[in-house]
Amino acid sequence: MDSEDETVEETVEGLLDDDGLPHGFCTVNYSSTDRFEGHFVHGEKNGRGKFYFFDGSTLEGFYVDDALQGQGIYTYEDGGSLHGTYVEGELNGPAQEYDTDGRLIFKGQYKDNVRHGVCWIYYPDGGSLVGEVNEDGDMTGDKVAYVYPDGRMALYGKFIDAEMLEGKLAILTSVDEGKPHFELVPNGPVYNFDKSTPSCISVNPLFPDPYESERVYVNDSLIHNAGEGLFAKVASAAQTVMSFYNGVRITHQEVDSREWALNGNTISLDDETVLDVPAPYNSYYKYCASLGHKANHSFSPNCMYDTFVHPRFGPIKCIRTMKAVEKDEELTVAYGYDHSVTGKNGPEAPEWYQQQLTAFQATQQK
């Protein structure tokens, strides 16, 4: 945040010219507790400089005649950053934004400090949004697309503030100087935003996800007494998103207060929400909009749970490979019951898990 216009200079540390103005390298402290360190020429910023704002954010770059010009870096108080092009102190031109881990989360253009033109928003899970933003810089319009983590399959259509209202199945064929080119799948299905509630898992429970349908299928598990399992439809590299875990959204308190038998398909989404696939939706013939709940537990898993922002389901979990998997290989995850919380006979976990744990520990001791 640049509050320079609203502040009054309090102190100057450094060289002054004959008129008492900063000249050379100086530190200027403002009454707002903002601070600027950089080069001055007779009271105007000229050369490299950096603002330190009261909220912990910073802005650095090259100044000409008291205004930021060219490439500048704004670092947010949480450590994320915006690398942009400045013209007379305003963001105008190409820009990239990065999260606190240094991952690219935005690429596009700015005009007069507002996102402009065709922009890309990147999610940590590998998915992305692309389209021409509106006059407020929001991803709103009828030519916006969500692109799945494979960078190929997409849902193209109408979005409001980055949320899909209606998307048609499409293929991203090319990207030319940041501008994507899509081909709609002939007679392809249309998808709508369908975030679950505590009582409704989906308005179209038998409408499968196109990305997931290319990568996994359900069959009898190879694990003894495990029922159905989730299998790879195609060979996939490590770190590939394979499947999605949607469910009704209930509280941790509700889960903790009921019997283990009712928690066979629950997974924690965050500190407040648990995703649950209850009966009858645990049957593939009643619910196949997402299949992540079909993955069975293993103490030597080839996959892991991860968070995912889905264009249809909203914030959910996904199943991501931890190593390369072969076609028709069963996908397994570690269910992650807490071994430090013990009951009378072992960890606070269902009986089948305790039995598998005992057997696994026995093999490790051989």
Curated annotation (Swiss-Prot):
Residues the UniProt record annotates as site (Histone H3K4 binding): 245, 256, 266, 317, 335
Instruction: Cite the entry's keywords alphabetically.
Output: Activator, Chromatin regulator, Chromosome, Methyltransferase, Nucleus, Repeat, S-adenosyl-L-methionine, Transcription, Transcription regulation, Transferase
**Which InterPro entries does UniProt cross-reference here?**
Hist-Lys_N-MeTrfase_SETD7, MORN, SET_dom, SET_dom_sf, SETD7_N, SETD7_SET
**Pfam families in UniProt:** MORN, SET, SET7_N
Q: Name one GO biological process term.
A: regulation of DNA-templated transcription
Tagged with keyword Transferase: yes
Protein name stated in the entry: Histone-lysine N-methyltransferase SETD7
The scientific name of the source species is Xenopus tropicalis (Western clawed frog)
Q: Which gene encodes it?
A: setd7
